[in-house]
Structure formats: C-alpha cells, structure tokens
From Swiss-Prot:
Keywords: Ribonucleoprotein, Ribosomal protein, RNA-binding, rRNA-binding. This is Large ribosomal subunit protein bL25. It comes from the Bacteria. SUPFAM superfamilies: Ribosomal protein L25-like. GO terms for biological process: translation. Part of the 50S ribosomal subunit; part of the 5S rRNA/L5/L18/L25 subcomplex. Contacts the 5S rRNA. Binds to the 5S rRNA independently of L5 and L18. InterPro entries: Rbsml_bL25/Gln-tRNA_synth_N, Ribosomal_bL25/Gln-tRNA_synth, Ribosomal_bL25_short, Ribosomal_L25_dom, Ribosomal_uL5_bac-type.
Length: 95
C-alpha cells in the first residue's frame, strides 16, 4: 500500500507551538537523514492516525509532499498519547 501525505514546513518551535498544533488537529514531525538538513513539518492528524493502523505504514517507503517537493521517508519513531488514541509526534528518516 502506498502512502502519500501533504506536509507544511513548521516555523514555530517549542512546547506551546506544538500544543497549539495538536489542539488544531495537526501533528508536529521532523524529517532527517541523508545529506540535507533536518526539516520540522506539520501533518494532518486524522490522515496519519487512519494510516498507522496498517502494518505496511511502518515498513514501506512513505511519500511526503513538503511545500510541493516529494520526499521519500520511512517512519523512524512515533510518540503516542498515554491513554488517548492520539499521535503526539513522528520522526521520519529519509529513504
């Protein structure tokens, strides 16, 4: 199954900015690895939450469209809320 998500570059950093994103139904994330610099991004929570129930989400290459540019990544780490069915943060590694 091929996964493709739209993402935006995140400019606001820190705990307060991340909490505001989560309150608005978005997830803060980061893309790192390769020769490029790490990029902080924001993704839609519902799209990722629906996709992460598939086993292939964790092993297949995922395409992120970051401001019009496609980047191939794999899930490196995912943080979940302790008791709510919500995602808190995702780390992606360039494939």
């Amino acid at each position: 199954m091929a996964f493709k998500f739209n993402a935006e570059v995140r400019t606001a950093q820190g705990k307060g900015a991340s909490r505001r994103l989560r309150h608005n139904g978005q997830i803060p994330a980061i893309v790192y690895g390769g020769s490029e610099a790490p990029v902080s991004i924001v993704l839609n929570h519902d799209e990722l939450n629906n996709a992460q129930v598939h086993d292939s989400f964790y092993s297949d290459v995922i395409t992120l469209v970051i401001d019009g540019k496609e980047v191939a990544v794999k899930v490196q780490a995912m943080q979940r809320h302790p008791f709510k069915p919500k995602l808190v943060h995702i780390d992606f590694k360039r494939a």
